[in-house]
């Protein structure tokens, strides 16, 4: 179980719009096969196009708003993400491996934004959180 006080205290400093936009953008650039779920977002032809795309930025914020809700409900991640798990499984048919990839990208983006403040201890706690969120989002698939 992650250290709730450490996670929530740190998370209050995160600029969800910036970090969300960068995390989703990086996912789409580093793992280009994930772009197939976002073809309706327009130009995703290059890293600059992806990172500058307003729809990518807006959806990245939406993703991190949901993650923020999870941070507030660490004791019930499955319940917190039940509807999103159903949506991504039954309607969108997203490969659940993508949740793990996005979680790892999020940790990288947090480290980039916070530098030395994102200590190894904090990273270890966030790895637990992103693994828990990925598992909760993949729950419907099992």
Swiss-Prot record:
| Alphabetized InterPro entries for the sequence | Globin, Globin-like_sf, Globin/Proto, Hemoglobin_b, Hemoglobin_oxygen_transport
Provide a GO biological process annotation.
hydrogen peroxide catabolic process
Q: Which SUPFAM superfamilies did the record assign? A: Globin-like (SSF46458)
* Molecular-function GO term, any one: peroxidase activity
Domain of life the protein comes from: Eukaryota
UniProt: heme b binding residues: 59, 88
Pfam families attached to this UniProt entry? Globin (PF00042)
Metal-binding keyword on record? yes
Instruction: Give the CC-aspect GO terms.
Output: blood microparticle; haptoglobin-hemoglobin complex; hemoglobin complex
**Domain Globin spans what residues?**
1-142
Tissues expressed in: Red blood cells.
Q: What CDD domains does UniProt report for this protein, alphabetically? A: Hb-beta-like
Record keyword Transcription regulation present: no
Q: Which UniProt keywords apply?
A: Heme, Iron, Metal-binding, Oxygen transport, Transport
Q: How does it assemble?
A: Heterotetramer of two alpha chains and two beta chains.
Q: What does this protein do?
A: Involved in oxygen transport from the lung to the various peripheral tissues.
The UniProt record's further free-text remark is:
This type of beta-C chain is found when anemia has been experimentally produced.
Family recorded in the similarity comment: Belongs to the globin family.
The protein's name in its UniProt record? Hemoglobin subunit beta-C
Q: Which organism is it from?
A: Capra hircus (Goat)
Name of the coding gene = HBBC
């Amino acid at each position: 179980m992650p250290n709730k006080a450490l996670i929530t205290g740190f998370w209050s400093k995160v600029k969800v719009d910036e970090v969300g936009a960068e995390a989703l953008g990086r996912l789409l650039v580093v793992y280009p096969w994930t772009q197939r779920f976002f073809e309706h977002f327009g130009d995703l032809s290059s890293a600059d196009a992806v990172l500058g795309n307003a729809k990518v930025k807006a959806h990245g914020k939406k993703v991190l708003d949901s993650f923020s809700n999870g941070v507030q409900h660490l004791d019930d991640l499955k319940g917190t993400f039940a509807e999103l798990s159903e949506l991504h499984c039954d309607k969108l048919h997203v490969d659940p491996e993508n949740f793990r990839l996005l979680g790892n990208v999020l940790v990288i983006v947090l480290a980039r934004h916070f530098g030395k403040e994102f200590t190894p201890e904090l990273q270890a706690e966030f790895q637990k959180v992103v693994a828990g969120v990925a598992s909760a989002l993949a729950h419907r698939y099992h």
